[in-house]
Structure formats: C-alpha cells, structure tokens
Amino acid sequence: MNQAAYRLEQTKLTDSKVFRDAVHNYIHVDQPLILDLINSHEMQRLRRIKQLGGTHQVYQSAEHSRFCHSLGVYFIARKMIFNSAIGAYLNDYDKLTVMCAALLHDIGHGPFSHCFEDAFDLNHEAYTIKIINGKTEVHDLLEKFDHGFSHRVSSVM
C-alpha cells in the first residue's frame, strides 16, 4: 500500500457504529479496520476483564471493563489527532496507526489487572505485542489491511 496515498475519507463506513460510553457519552467508529478490531475475539475478551481488578468488590461503581477503557483511549487518541495541532503533522496512514495502537494498547491484559501481573511476574505490554504480532485474529486483520501493519502498530506500544 502506498502510505502517502492512503486516505481515511475513502475508507469510511457509510454509517458509523456508535458505542454508548459512561465517560465519553458517544464513541463513533467510522473506520472498517477499527470496527473489525473491536469485533475481534481478542478485543471482545476484554469485556470480561475489569479495569480495576477486584476493586469493584469494595467500590461497587468500579465496574468498567478493559474493553470500555480501550474504547475510551481510542476516542481520546482520535480526538487528539483530528481536533488538535498534532494531527497536522500526521498523514492519514499515521493517524490510523495511532488509532489502532490506542485501541489495542491493553489487549494483553489478563484477569485482575495489574494484581495478576505482580503475582505471576507477567507483563501485559509483552502479551499485547505477542497478540498483535502473533497468530491471532487481530494480527490477521492488521496484515489484511497492509502487509507489515501489525509491526507498525506494535512499534508504537
């Protein structure tokens, strides 16, 4: 793919997918790759992982998932690159790279968040890179978009 010629406008969905979010209100997704990543098995797994581990046992309102958090990070990254001076320095291919990296940044998290990592001496960042570059649905989607795109996204992590 010619990175310089890639245009986000040309690949937009005709109808954006809208996610209702407790923090950001509405999160619009209009890029097919982003929507495909959201629908992947690896991203959907994050719906069952609490953002704050076992904290919800003490604070009943601390119920949000890694999935919701990842959508929120995607939303903020998207807002930054389209509504600020930062975006002026990025071409559309770079913008999509940033949005994918933001969405996938926590995909390697296990149950009970960082407590699990501490107990078993694991690193979610390393698992995130393994998921993005390994034999996964996420990897296949990124590579289908453009050969080498999975490594480009993981290099941002």
Predicted features and spans:
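Sequence-structural signature of the catalytic-core scaffold of metal-dependent phosphohydrolases
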Residues: 1-49, 57-99, 110-157
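Short active-site segment of divalent metal-dependent hydrolases/proteases
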Residues: 104, 108-109
